[in-house]
């Protein structure tokens, strides 16, 4: 014989309907709780359940299936914990990660798909709990401008695919680029960028950055890196390039860029939008940070705008003379010293300044749509490559075409 405590608080009885405020101690479906409440009504029909204080009934109920349900939930939770442990070890392949990373299921409902948490704010257990989360002492969702459960799943999933340390999502790829630059740079600092870039990125770096923010962008020829080492100065805060440039599809000498940058203590930031984590493993090639316009291949369905920046865990700002903003107390954010956060320094500062303060946040709905597209990334990229091969070879054989820029053609300098 097994028993289970059921707690029921009845708010109203109207034409046989029962409204329950709260059930506790077990994870029993609402229909089961409603049946229990009706049994109380049948036992005490004369009680007035509508007056305050609300009637509170606790009783013993012999129900074998409830105990079985609790046991099932315990097994499910153990399985979810094991899944989380395996994902943290990154022991799964790319296809599995793009489907499951960042989401362990909903233990409260049993839902296996990622829900759309379309909410602006969240509930707190107490005023102290809210204060601790707002100051960053405790983790949690406090406001969707800063963090949202749906967006967080997308961040964790992209981070797993990039084999990174932390990812922050933004409202667009351009917002992600500006956030990355302004996280590393203060007025008077410099950014080195290769010349072959997406038009919007080129306009921001070489047309707006110095004029509006006092940050100088130094341009280096993508096809000739001989001037890269000489261009690095005490003011240099990052070197920026695209893994596969948009739209010329040129490929820089990544090994030379990484070697030169690290010899001078400068982080390497790669726009991996065209390469994607599937075609280009930035971490394995020495890159320190990646960014994406998730609008393009990450999403793949043309329905959502977004961007992200991922810290790949290879560059440390602690004690670096190039980055005093990470090593000094930040009066604007509770005197936080970001370097003290270790591996979370870059993501935390970016989230504080560009989500909390500036509102560059990705909407939950865009994150939800992006997650749907991300599930097929590997299959889509394989087909993209097959299609691009066919088109490039067709054009290369055409007497009406003078030049084809495609790295997989034998005559390409990047082949």
Language-model features, listed with the residues they occupy:
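Glycine-centered tight turns that cap/initiate beta-strands
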Residues: 163, 400-403
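Short, positively charged and aromatic/hydrophobic N-terminal segments
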Residues: 9, 26-27, 37, 44, ...
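Extreme N-terminal basic, low-complexity initiation segments
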Residues: 2-9
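N-terminal glycine-rich, Lys/His-bearing helix-loop that initiates the first secondary-structure elements
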Residues: 84-138
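Conserved PLP-enzyme active-site core in the AAT-like
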Residues: 90, 98-107, 167-397, 405, ...
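Conserved N-terminal alpha-helix of the aminotransferase class I/II PLP-enzyme fold
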Residues: 121, 126-178, 200-208
């Amino acid at each position: 014989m097994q028993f289970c405590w059921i707690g029921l608080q009845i708010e109203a009885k109207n034409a046989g309907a029962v409204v329950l405020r709260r059930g506790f101690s077990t994870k029993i479906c609402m229909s089961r709780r409603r049946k229990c409440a009706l049994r109380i009504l049948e036992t005490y029909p004369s009680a007035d359940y509508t007056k305050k204080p609300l009637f509170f009934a606790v009783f013993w109920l012999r129900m074998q299936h409830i105990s079985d349900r609790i046991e099932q939930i315990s097994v499910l939770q153990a399985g979810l914990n094991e899944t989380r442990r395996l994902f943290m070890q990154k022991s799964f392949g790319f296809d599995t990660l793009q489907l499951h990373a960042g989401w362990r299921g909903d233990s409260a409902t049993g839902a296996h798909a990622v829900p759309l948490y379309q909410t602006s704010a969240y509930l707190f257990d107490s005023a102290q709990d809210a204060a601790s989360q707002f100051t960053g002492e405790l983790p949690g969702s406090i406001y969707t401008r800063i963090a949202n459960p749906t967006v967080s799943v997308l961040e964790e999933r992209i981070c797993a695919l990039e084999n990174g340390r932390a990812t922050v999502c933004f409202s667009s790829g351009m917002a992600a680029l500006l956030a990355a630059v302004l996280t590393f740079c203060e007025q008077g600092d410099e950014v080195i960028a290769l010349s072959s870039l997406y038009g919007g990125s080129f306009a921001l770096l070489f047309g707006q950055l110095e004029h509006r923010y006092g940050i100088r962008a130094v341009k280096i020829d993508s096809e000739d890196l001989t001037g890269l080492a000489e261009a690095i100065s005490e003011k240099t805060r990052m070197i920026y390039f695209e893994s596969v440039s948009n739209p010329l599809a040129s490929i820089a000498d990544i090994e030379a860029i990484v070697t030169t940058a690290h010899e001078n203590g400068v982080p390497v930031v790669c726009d991996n939008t065209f390469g994607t984590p599937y075609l280009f493993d930035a971490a394995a090639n020495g890159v320190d940070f990646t960014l994406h316009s998730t609008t393009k291949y990450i999403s793949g369905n043309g329905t959502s705008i977004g961007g992200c920046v991922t810290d790949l865990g290879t560059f440390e700002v602690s004690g670096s003379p190039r980055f005093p903003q990470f090593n000094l107390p930040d009066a604007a954010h509770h005197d936080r010293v970001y370097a003290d956060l270790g591996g979370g320094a870059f993501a935390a500062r970016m989230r504080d300044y560009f989500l909390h303060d500036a509102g560059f946040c990705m909407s939950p709905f865009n994150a939800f749509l992006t997650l749907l597209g991300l599930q097929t990334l590997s299959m889509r990229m394989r087909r993209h490559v097959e299609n691009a091969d066919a088109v490039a070879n067709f054009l290369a054989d055409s007497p009406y075409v003078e030049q084809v820029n495609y790295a997989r053609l034998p005559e390409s300098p990047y082949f």
